[in-house]
Amino acid sequence: MNLFQIVAICGMISPILYTLMWILGGVLRPDYSHIRDDVSSLIAVGAPRKRFFDVFLITSSVLLFVFYLGLHWGINNGEGSFVGPILFVASGILGILVAFFFPLDPGGEIVIRRGKMHLILVVTSGLLTIAGMVALWFRLASVEGWSTFANYSLVSAIVSFLLVIIAAIFMKGRYRGLVERPMVTAFQLYYFITSLMVFLTN
C-alpha cells in the first residue's frame, strides 16, 4: 500500500464517520429530529452529547483535509491543473475551523458572531467544494481512465449547487433537516467516490 492509497482511505473514512454521526444523533438523542434539525445542531453550544459528536466531526474533517493534501498528485500522476485540489484544500481548512472553533449557538440557532461565522464558513466551504468539482471536470474530461469520473464531478457540482439553494430556502423552516440530508449526502458521496478513484488508480 502506497502513500496515495493511505490518504485515499482517509478520504473514504471521512464521509462514513460524518454520516454515522448524524444517524447516531437520531438514535442517541430522543430530542433530535432528522426532519426538523440540521446536522450542525448536534454540535451546537450546549447540545446534549456534544463532545461525543465533536469527535466524529473533528475526525471526519481532519481525515478529509489529509486526503485533499494528496489529491493533486493522486489524480493522473499529478498531471494537470492545481486549481481543483487547491480549492478542495481551502474548503478543508474551513471545515476544520468550523469543527474546532465555530459551532452553532445554543439550540442550533445563529445569533452571535460564532454562530454567524459557522454559517459563513460552512457555505463558503461548500461553494469552494463545488468549484473544485467543476475544476476537476475541466482537468480530467479528456484524460483516459478519468473521463467518466470527470462527468460525475460535473453532475455532482450541478446537483450539489441546486441542493444548497433548496436547503437555504428551507433553512428556517420546520423541515430543514429533511431538506438538508440530500445535500450533505451528495457531498459525502462525492468525497467517497473521489477517494475510491484515487485508491484504485494508484
Report the location of each language-model feature.
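Hydrophobic, aromatic-enriched alpha-helical segments typical of multi-pass transmembrane helices
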Residues: 2-31, 38, 42, 46-201
